[in-house]
Every structure is written in C-alpha cells, then in structure tokens.
C-alpha cells in the first residue's frame, strides 16, 4: 500500500513537471543580456539571434519603458522605440524581463506588447518574464509566452525542499513556457525540473576567459536549457548542443 501511494506521488510530481516543448527555439542558445539601449539593440541584433531587455511599465504614462530600475524611465526610451532599432525583429527572439509586472498592470502591459508585435509583424518569438504568477497568468490569456523567474537560493534563505515544493506549485498553477534563473541555480533546475524549458542568465564578465567559455558550453549542452544570457560582445560557436 505504501509503495502504491509513493508511486502515485512520484507520478503526480512528474506530470506537474512536464511541459510540452512546442516553442520553436532557434539553433543558437546564446542570447545577448541586458540590451538596454538603442545602440546595443542595433549592434547586438546583428550578431545574436536572441536579445534580452529589461522593461518597466509606467502607469502614469501608460507606457512600457526600457530600463532596469524605475529611474531609468527618465531616459524616455520606450519599448516600441527600442524595437525600431532591432534589425529584422520578426526574425529574432526576445526575452523581456519585466521589473514591475503585477496583476494590476498585466493586461495593459500585454496589450502594448501585442500591439508592438503586430506592428513589427512578429509572431510567437517573444517571452515575458516575471516572478509574479498571477500577473503572468493574465499575460498568458493574451496568447503571449511567459517565463517564470524562480526563487534564487543564492539570494534568499530558503531550504531546498521548500524551494522545490513552491516551484512545483507555481508550475502547476501557471504552466509557464519556461523557468529562469541565474546559472548558479542550473543544477537544481535540471535535476528537479528537467522537462521544463530552462532559460539561464550566466553571470560572467564580458571577456571570453577560458573558464567563462567552458561554463557557457556546459550550460548549452544540456537539452533542457534553451537559452543562456551572456555579456559577450558576440556569440560563441558551440557545437553539438542538446535541443
């Protein structure tokens, strides 16, 4: 009887962890990190297939601005203007890291993004990232892809068992298109959620040091890992990456 119950629990766990890989990812898993101005957008979009940009929604102006912090909105760079600088946006892939997405502004954010995608003739090549599951559920209703940023054990004092339980609960609630975190969480993510699409931010200097390149290769070769954000000036040529 105990074995039967244990088997059921394991099966339920696997079902929760499963996620259909129905997104058509590009061949290159190496995406440019924090492309937060138009100059970078022009340069990086010529070299990288995928770009990550930080975004902040301004309720006062009902507009999405590019920036990592609230004060960055003073630069006045809207997400729409940023996309104008990207070379052939319909042929690229985008990871939008929303810093203040919540259930109150999620509908407006999604409407703006959908409008941008339509004007740029973009189709299913963009992800919206946040840690707020309620907000992401709203964004999903607009047929947009979502990335769930999981809690980072390197930053917060949470035990591993609690992290696994909480993450599994959020996956079940949201059914995200991918999970994300910095590369320090790589081991836990691929061990406990191997069926999920995993997006990682590799915290490395811009230089192509041997240890940095080795780490990039390691991350990209895992089939669960679909995108790795780097600060290199250009992508690396990595062969035999798992799909």
Descriptions of predicted regions:
Residues 1-24:
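Bacterial Sec-dependent N-terminal signal peptides
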Residues 18-243:
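Phosphate-group recognition and catalysis centered on beta-loop-alpha active-site segments
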């Amino acid at each position: 009887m105990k074995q039967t119950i244990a088997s059921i629990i394991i099966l339920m766990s696997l079902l929760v962890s499963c996620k259909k890989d129905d997104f058509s990812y590009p061949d290159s898993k190496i995406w440019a990190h924090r492309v937060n101005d138009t100059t970078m957008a022009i340069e990086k979009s010529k070299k990288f297939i995928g770009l990550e940009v930080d975004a902040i929604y301004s309720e006062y102006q009902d507009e999405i601005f590019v920036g990592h912090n609230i004060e960055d909105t003073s630069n006045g760079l809207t997400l729409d203007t940023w996309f104008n600088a990207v070379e052939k946006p319909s042929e690229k892939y985008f990871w939008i890291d929303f810093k203040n997405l919540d259930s109150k502004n999620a509908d407006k954010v999604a409407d703006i993004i959908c409008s941008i995608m339509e004007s740029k003739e973009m189709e299913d090549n963009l992800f919206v990232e946040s840690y707020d599951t309620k907000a992401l559920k709203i964004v999903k209703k607009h047929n947009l892809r979502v990335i769930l940023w999981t809690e980072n054990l390197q930053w917060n004092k949470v035990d591993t068992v609690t992290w696994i339980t909480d993450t599994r609960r959020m996956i079940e609630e949201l059914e995200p298109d991918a999970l994300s975190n910095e590369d320090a969480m790589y081991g836990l993510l691929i061990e406990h959620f191997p069926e999920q699409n995993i997006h990682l931010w590799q915290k490395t200097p811009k230089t192509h040091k041997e240890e940095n390149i080795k780490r990039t290769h390691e991350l990209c070769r895992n089939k669960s890992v679909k995108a790795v954000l780097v600060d290199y000036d250009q992508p690396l040529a990595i062969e035999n990456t798992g799909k």
